[in-house]
Curated annotation (Swiss-Prot):
GO terms for molecular function: sodium:proton antiporter activity. This is Na(+)/H(+) antiporter NhaA. The chain crosses the membrane at residues 27-47, 67-87, 108-128, 137-157, 166-186, 194-214, 216-236, 314-334, 343-363, 381-401, 414-434. The gene is nhaA. GO terms for cellular component: plasma membrane. Its main location: membrane.
């Protein structure tokens, strides 16, 4: 495992990678909230007609007289979101191999927490919608928006322990994995066998590339596009293709870190061996060659998985998810909305606000009492409850599942209003709860210091 960790990011790299992830996701959450607010304002202002008309704009190209394309809304939800799910898949793979989910013992607690945070909200929703046309939306309150949740923790600053942040990230990664499984199993249309067979063949080729030691990302990208097309046509949501692609991206770099260190040392010595005065004015051809080789080796020593994840992170955090939020969070609130459609509103709201913390705290408590899992060091039960409240922020992932679960526009609008309301309430509740908890903890530590 130590050897694999070097492939991921070097000594101490996992912690740096995690801190960078938390930092970027936290700011992304604040930006997402801003985009959601702008979307709601646009949908309920004089711009309303233009806002909704924009997403129905057809974008594509003609082959002869045949138009191949989709609405802008579908380009965002099916194509752009595939890049987000590719990043999610890479994060899941990295966490399973090197992170907090590496090994059964380390993964047990956050995995059980995520399981509780998915099962109980689904049960709560089903209790309100059993036997109705809206029962298919049980997956909506199962999701957690990690960017929003970490954004709330960012507002609390250094008062929140790193252990709690790590737990919340680990929980969210498993939650994302659960969401992928739910989408693949429960929100799949009638399967087209031939296209499914094509998908399996292409996936086999991707696995073959990995096994053959191909480290260039270009062939994976080509086959990834073909996989997206075949999965989209076979009836499974195309974002699942992105997750499958992520799991075939190689972890091991082209050059081992020990070999890179030796080669880099030799190249630097060769660079410095040339005339210094000449080098100050114009690099000699040998020096240029050394620099080019060093640059090439620097890329080859990086894990393809981590390199791709780093490349996708800023695009996902500051473009893809904000665009998705702006395109999907806008709901025109009017007297024509029927909030009493089955039990959609209470099912989603109570599922996220109550079901999430109860499920996370309840199942982890039982697991520890039964000796199945152990709480992370430095994380108290009251912290688990606070994290459970923040996990109730469903937002983007819940909205994404809403679009798959409902075909009725009225049910979709009610679900989005419920998601936005519940996410806002869960975020505020989690913020004040953890803030008060940190304040009492600080006072207690101060008292202990005075006594000692």
């Amino acid at each position: 495992m130590a050897e694999n960790q070097d492939y991921a990011s070097g000594n101490g790299g996992i912690k740096a990678l995690l801190l960078n992830f938390i930092h970027s996701q936290s700011f992304s959450g604040i930006f997402l909230f801003f985009c959601a607010v702008v979307a709601m304002i646009s949908a309920n202002s004089a711009l309303s007609e233009s806002y909704f008309h924009l997403w129905h704009t057809e974008i594509g190209f003609f082959i002869g007289e045949t138009f191949i394309g989709m609405s802008l809304h579908h380009w965002i939800n099916d194509v752009l979101m595939s890049f987000f799910f590719l990043m999610v898949g890479l994060e899941i793979k990295r966490e399973l191999l090197f992170g907090e989910l590496a090994g059964i013992k380390r993964a047990a607690f956050p995995a059980i927490a995520a399981l509780g945070g998915m099962i109980v909200p689904a049960i709560v929703y089903t209790l309100f919608n059993f036997g109705t046309d809206s029962a298919h939306g049980f997956g909506i309150p199962m999701a957690t928006d990690i960017a929003f949740a970490l954004g709330v923790l960012l507002l609390l600053g250094d008062k929140v322990s790193l252990a709690l942040k790590v737990f919340l990230v680990s929980l969210a990664v498993v939650d994302d994995l659960g969401a992928v499984v739910v989408i693949a199993i429960f929100y799949t249309e009638d399967l087209q066998t031939l296209w499914l067979l094509y998908s399996v063949v292409i996936l086999g080729l991707l696995i073959g590339l990995n096994k053959m030691g191909v480290r260039s990302l270009f062939p994976y990208a080509i086959l990834g596009v073909l996989l997206w097309i075949t999965v989209h046509n076979c009836g499974i949501h195309a974002t699942i293709a992105a997750v499958a692609l992520a799991f075939t991206i190689p972890v091991k770099p082209k050059i081992e870190s020990e070999n890179f260190a030796q080669e880099a040392k030799e190249l630097l010595e060769r660079f410095l061996s040339h005339d210094k005065e000449r080098a100050n004015l114009l690099l000699a051809s040998e020096q240029v060659h050394s620099v080019e080789l060093l640059s090439k080796h620097s890329k080859s020593v990086q894990s393809p998985l981590v390199r791709l994840e780093h490349a996708l992170h800023p695009w996902s955090a500051y473009f893809i998810m904000p665009v998705f939020a702006f395109a999907n969070a806008g709901v025109a609130i009017s007297s024509n909305i029927h909030f009493d459609i089955d039990g959609v509103l209470p099912g989603i709201m109570l599922g996220l606000i109550v079901g999430k913390p109860v499920g996370i705290l309840g199942l982890t408590y039982l697991a520890e009492k039964m000796g199945i899992a152990t709480r992370p060091e430095g994380v108290m039960w009251i912290d688990i409850l606070g994290a459970g409240m923040l996990a109730g922020i469903g937002f983007t992932m819940s909205i994404f599942i809403t679009n798959l679960a409902f075909t009725n526009p009225e049910a979709t609008d009610v679900a989005k209003i419920a998601i936005l309301s519940a996410s806002l309430f869960a975020g505020a509740l989690g913020y004040f709860f953890i803030s008060i908890r940190c304040r009492f903890k600080k006072k207690k530590e101060a008292c202990c210091t005075i006594k000692s």
